UniProtKB/Swiss-Prot annotation:
Protein name: 2-C-methyl-D-erythritol 2,4-cyclodiphosphate synthase
UniProt KW Cytoplasm keyword: no
EC number assigned by the record: 4.6.1.12
Cofactor note: Binds 1 divalent metal cation per subunit.
Residues engaged in binding a divalent metal cation: 9, 11, 43
Lineage: Bacteria, Pseudomonadati, Pseudomonadota, Gammaproteobacteria, Pasteurellales
Pathway: Isoprenoid biosynthesis; isopentenyl diphosphate biosynthesis via DXP pathway; isopentenyl diphosphate from 1-deoxy-D-xylulose 5-phosphate: step 4/6
UniProt KW keywords: Isoprene biosynthesis, Lyase, Metal-binding
Reaction(s) catalysed (UniProt annotation): 4-CDP-2-C-methyl-D-erythritol 2-phosphate = 2-C-methyl-D-erythritol 2,4-cyclic diphosphate + CMP
Subunit record text: Homotrimer.
Length: 162
């Protein structure tokens, strides 16, 4: 059996950089406003994983009203959510992430993001795709007011599990 999940996240720029995207620190003059570390890619991916298994969303599992998640490392949140997926007998088939930002440029960091995500999901790097696009200077991302991200994940039932 397979399950598909979709996730979305957005954060506004604010404060000082760097920013963390896909588990990778990216030098930038602005930071991202968030309760945790503001990693839009890992937040969207975590939401996609949880959604695929009908486990709610990142806000349900890691509420921003809980002080223990203040400044939280999104890699830790991703690994915790993925463990819930593994516990239900599923594993990642593939992941596809689209980062939507006018700036900073993501291309130099994408291979590192893929490596980090593959490590956290215990899968091959070939199962993880990360790409970036702009909105051609339209909307809040086009005005460099923030960053958005979408993620799609395919989960596959592991052999021998109920």
């Amino acid at each position: 059996m397979i399950r598909i999940g979709h996730g979305f996240d957005v954060h506004a720029f604010g404060g000082e950089g760097p920013i963390i995207i896909g588990g990778v620190a990216i030098p930038y003059e602005k930071g991202l406003v968030a309760h945790s570390d503001g990693d839009v890619a890992l937040h969207a991916l975590t939401d996609a994983l949880l959604g695929a298994m009908a486990l709610g969303d990142i806000g349900k599992l890691f509420p921003d009203t809980d002080i223990q998640y203040k400044g939280a490392d999104s890699r830790r949140l991703l690994r915790t959510a993925y463990q819930a997926i593994l516990d239900k007998g599923y594993q990642v088939g593939n992941v596809d992430i689209t980062i939507i930002a006018q700036a900073p440029k993501m291309r130099p960091y994408i291979d590192s993001m893929r490596t980090v995500i593959a490590q956290d999901l215990h899968c091959d790097i070939e199962q993880v795709n990360v790409k970036a696009t702009t909105t051609e200077k339209l909307g809040f991302t086009g005005r460099s007011e923030g960053i958005a991200c979408e993620a799609v994940v395919l989960l596959i039932k592991q052999n021998g599990t109920k």
